[in-house]
């Protein structure tokens, strides 16, 4: 009789444990799914027109994903060159900032870089052999701070515009297409950074 009761008790405990595990599994699944969907929503932040806000949402999402590949790099990783013609992760982040800075003056002021801006951004914009010599021995934070500063300016400038401005043509492209290009440019280099950082 005692043995039967013990068996029944153990089976009941086992069943209860299984039920708890199932509950935990579904709870974790729900939380993970909710997190993934919340991260994947394109939604205009407060203060922006609809189309510009959607672009900001995508730009910022991509920027976070770019930075995920590099934020923990040490100095060796920041300056790492995949081969003699490659660009380092630090240089690529600088390049992303320079490209975005260029499209700021192009879309908001209708011009190219002036002499002072060229001195600041041209090497990072074009990269190449001289950039490989110059862009080293600085921590990844140095480059990420530059990127942050440029993005903050982009967002402040875009907040002053509306979707009618976004549709306007400037040169051979609309303002919308220009900022789409900035976004796809980030995506291109995100893949490059993913490859490079796996080789470090």
Predicted feature residues:
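Short, helix-capping/interhelical loops that line the mouth of catalytic, cofactor-
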Residues: 38-54, 102-151, 164, 200
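Hydrophobic core segments within long, regular secondary-structure runs in both alpha-
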Residues: 63, 67, 147-151, 155
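Hydrophobic alpha-helical segments, especially transmembrane helices
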Residues: 20-24, 64, 101, 152
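Basic/aromatic DNA-contact patch characteristic of tyrosine site-specific recombinases
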Residues: 71
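Short, contiguous alpha-helical
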Residues: 56-60, 67, 78-126, 164-200
């Amino acid at each position: 009789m005692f043995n039967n009761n013990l068996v029944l008790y153990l089976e009941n405990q086992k069943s209860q444990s299984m039920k708890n595990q199932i509950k935990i599994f579904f709870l974790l699944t729900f939380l993970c799914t909710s997190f993934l969907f919340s991260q994947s929503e394109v939604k205009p932040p407060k203060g922006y027109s609809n189309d510009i806000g959607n672009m900001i949402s995508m730009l910022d999402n991509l920027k976070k994903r770019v930075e995920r590949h590099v934020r923990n790099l040490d100095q060796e990783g920041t300056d790492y060159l995949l081969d003699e013609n490659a660009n380092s992760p630090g240089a690529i982040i600088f390049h992303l900032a320079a490209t975005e800075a260029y499209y700021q003056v192009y879309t908001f002021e209708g011009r190219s870089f002036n002499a002072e801006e060229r001195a600041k951004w041209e090497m990072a914009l074009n990269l190449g052999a001289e950039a490989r010599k110059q862009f080293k021995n600085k921590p990844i934070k140095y480059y990420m701070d530059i990127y942050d500063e440029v993005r903050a300016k982009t967002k402040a400038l875009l907040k002053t515009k509306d979707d009618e401005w976004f549709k306007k043509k400037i040169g051979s492209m609309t303002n919308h297409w220009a900022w789409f290009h900035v976004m796809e440019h980030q995506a291109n280099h995100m893949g490059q950074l993913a490859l490079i950082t796996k080789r470090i």
